[in-house]
């Protein structure tokens, strides 16, 4: 998991659209902390700081420690609503991480040792089907990324979830199938060349070039010839 982020917050005393608009005019973003078998906690955070953390690129996959009222609450961002025109954050949801609990998260995959893949060396292309894996993880063991080794992979090979050794405390959220994460495919130029060869091999032969004995007794109209009665 990426290093935890710290986000100072203040309690939100009033709810409703009017109160939320007033907070936004003051440069604050209304938010809520929920989950963990506790009542939701309404808060508001500084807009500039929230934007800064969003710009890290890993905010939604980071533990965010929210400081409020002298306490620190470990959370995981679940949603940030943005204004449709300005893209400014309008509201944020944080899921409270209960001690000893588990949570479903999306964790990015990173492919390693591409230089050790014969297929990639020959010009093959890694076609990534899933850029993230849906995992069920222990709250204190959320991985920042999943490394996938492509050493020895040839063109035509596929990488399935069953091949991946997940970190301790993590398991796939999808358990009903051995889904594909990536495949190693031939470059488009090679595919086109192979396709042309297949077309040439499968071309129909001109009937005039076939000996009469091999034309199965069909006449010029394509009907089977019959002997005289």
Curated annotation (Swiss-Prot):
Keywords on record: Ribonucleoprotein, Ribosomal protein, RNA-binding, rRNA-binding
CDD domains: Ribosomal_L25_TL5_CTC
Region of interest called Disordered, as start-end residue ranges on this chain: 1-21, 187-229
Gene3D superfamilies attached to this UniProt entry: Ribosomal protein L25, beta domain, Ribosomal Protein L25, Chain P
Source organism, top-level taxon: Bacteria
Cysteines engaged in disulfide bonds, as pairs: none
Self-association and partners: Part of the 50S ribosomal subunit; part of the 5S rRNA/L5/L18/L25 subcomplex. Contacts the 5S rRNA. Binds to the 5S rRNA independently of L5 and L18.
Assigned protein family: Belongs to the bacterial ribosomal protein bL25 family. CTC subfamily.
Name under which the protein is recorded: Large ribosomal subunit protein bL25
């Amino acid at each position: 998991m990426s290093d935890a982020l710290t986000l100072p917050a203040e309690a939100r005393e009033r709810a409703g659209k009017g109160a939320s608009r007033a907070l936004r005019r003051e440069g604050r973003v209304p938010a809520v902390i929920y989950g963990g078998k506790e009542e939701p906690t309404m808060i508001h955070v500084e807009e500039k700081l929230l934007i800064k953390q969003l710009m890290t690129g890993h905010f939604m996959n980071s533990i965010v420690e929210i400081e409020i009222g002298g306490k620190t609450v470990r959370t995981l961002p679940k949603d940030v609503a943005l204004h449709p025109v300005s893209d400014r954050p309008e509201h944020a949801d944080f899921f409270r991480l209960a001690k000893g609990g588990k949570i479903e998260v999306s964790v990015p995959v990173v492919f390693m040792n591409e230089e050790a893949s014969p297929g990639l060396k020959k010009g093959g292309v890694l076609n990534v089907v899933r850029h993230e894996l849906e995992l069920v993880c222990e709250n204190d063991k959320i991985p920042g990324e999943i490394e996938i080794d492509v050493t020895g992979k040839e063109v035509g090979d596929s990488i399935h979830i069953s091949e991946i050794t997940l970190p301790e405390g993590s398991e796939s959220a999808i358990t009903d199938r051995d889904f594909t994460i990536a495949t190693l495919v031939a470059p488009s130029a090679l595919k086109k060349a192979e396709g042309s060869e297949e077309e040439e091999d499968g071309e129909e032969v001109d009937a005039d070039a076939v000996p009469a004995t091999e034309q199965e007794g069909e006449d010029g109209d394509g009907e089977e010839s019959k002997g005289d009665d």
